[in-house]
Amino acid sequence: MSGYDFPMLSTVADVATLVSTRAAFHTLAERVLAPDLQRATGRIGLRRTAGGFGQPEHVVDGVRRRIRVDGMFLVVDHDGDGESWHDITTLGAAAALVGLPPDAETGVFVATSAGDPDAPLAVDPVAAATIAEWFRFVDTALEEFRHRHAALHPSVVQLWPEHFDLACSIGEINFGGSPGDAGDSGRVEPYLYVGPWSPPPVGGFWNEPYGAALERSAVTTVDDALEFFERGLAAAS
């Protein structure tokens, strides 16, 4: 696989909109999609979906169901009733839509995203599209990486709601991509990462306490991402 071109992050005119949109999506992932999925299946792992991210399809009382985020909308796919599209407004409204209290938890992790049920969830359409495209790019790279190393029994690619990143693992090494970090520390720009479960000391390839990261501005094609993941696998093995 080669030559997969990807729009530069400069398509987002204001980085602040990327940060606020990412924060809103993190809230929805942690406090709505994951708790709803956990009560139905006992699992929390989400997926990259067309237009954004969402639950894997699952069956509740014999009915196929999935909730996902597509751009500015929360989409409920209920087999037989079709899809219903709802504007993203607040955590309280999103939770009520799926029949959850706004303070719902999974019992698997402690949510760290904003939890005010009445605060507006600020979603910018350009930033939402940028995040969706980044997840598509990361998913493409991870699936090719998994295919190359099928003999090592890689895990499936999942979007982890507590971190809001897309990742898989090979042995005791995580490989993934984040749309950026929350809070005042970390990386504002989307980035790829390699995270050994027992991180090596910082130095050389290992440029983060958890392992290694490569910012979006240094990545042009899927081949670039694959080269980074391959370097990480070799360095950690």
List each model region and its residues.
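N-terminal ordered "arm"
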Residues: 1-70
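Alpha-helix initiation/capping motif
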Residues: 49, 89-90, 124, 215
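Charged, low-complexity surface segments at secondary-structure and domain boundaries
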Residues: 5-15, 78-81, 112-127, 212-219
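Amphipathic, interaction-prone secondary-structure segments
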Residues: 41-72, 153-196
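Surface-exposed beta-loop interaction hotspot
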Residues: 92-157
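Hydrophobic, ordered structural segments
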Residues: 65-112
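Long, compositionally biased interface segments
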Residues: 201-237
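Short, Φ-rich (hydrophobic/aromatic) sequence segments
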Residues: 18-36, 134-146, 225-233
